[in-house]
Amino acid sequence: MTNILVTGGCGFIASNFLNIMKEKYPHYKFINLDYIDYCSNELNVKPGTATLVKGDIRDKDLLTYLIKQYDFDIVFHFAAKSHVDNSFEDPKDFTLNNAYGTHVILETFRENKPNVEFIHFSTDEVYGESTTGIPFSEDTGVLRPTNPYAASKAAAEMIVQSYIYSYKMNIKTIRCNNVYGPNQFPEKLIPKFKKLLKEGKKCTIHGTKSAQIKRAFMHVEDVVNAVDIVWKKGESGEIYNIASDDEISVIEVTKLMIKTITGSENYDKYITFIEDRPFNDSRYYICSQKLKKLGWKQNKTRHDLINFLKD
């Protein structure tokens, strides 16, 4: 039997990963390690999908016990603090969770199961702001994160790289665009605005440059498919971008949501501008040709986003 550890499995992306992967690989055993943060929910994971262990990724004794108990074949490390706004308020918490937490997991496996397969889930934000028309590739030499969340994830990646080179651990890293779909906590743009509009409230947009700020949104099913492909076909030590081909400005996606959910084109009625972040990257433009060569493609389109908004 293949034993799999999934960290943060009650969160948004990881819960969808568990639900989809268990259906695809019913004979695999999944252990879900999650301390159930405010944005996580046990009910996100379908009954019978995984064994839930409530605990912290920084608890080395617990990790050691789990490794000895289950002798894991692979780790999918999703657990992370991810809300950028919160990272401005408490940057240290993000460093402790995302960078130090990753270090504890890696070190515990190095000591107890160094040959484990390890998939590290990161973010496009480690690249920093895109200021040219050339997309970032995995070979981009310098990471320039501009907010505490992105910096904590970049720091985690540096630790990952050191374990690849120093200890020859089998690790693959994934950097992903913005994701939407079921189980997402309503603090990120799409679920937040969807909730506000259904309640008859206004969407709150940071700053006044929303026409210049662009994001690429992907459905979580496409992301889970990419993670599965990286696991099965990716090379150890490599990094893979998961990028959407459908980039849209914040103001455009907000107007799309308003029209889809309310039926109105009186956009001013449903939009209010609030104070901008200390720094707000205008764009994360990344390339996923490396992943596409493994056979991945984006199946969900903007039409699927519209259908998701209608639900």
Residue locations for each model-derived region?
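Non-catalytic, surface-exposed connector residues within folded enzymatic/regulatory domains
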Residues: 88, 170-173, 187, 251, ...
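Hydrophobic alpha-helical packing elements
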Residues: 13, 62, 94, 152, ...
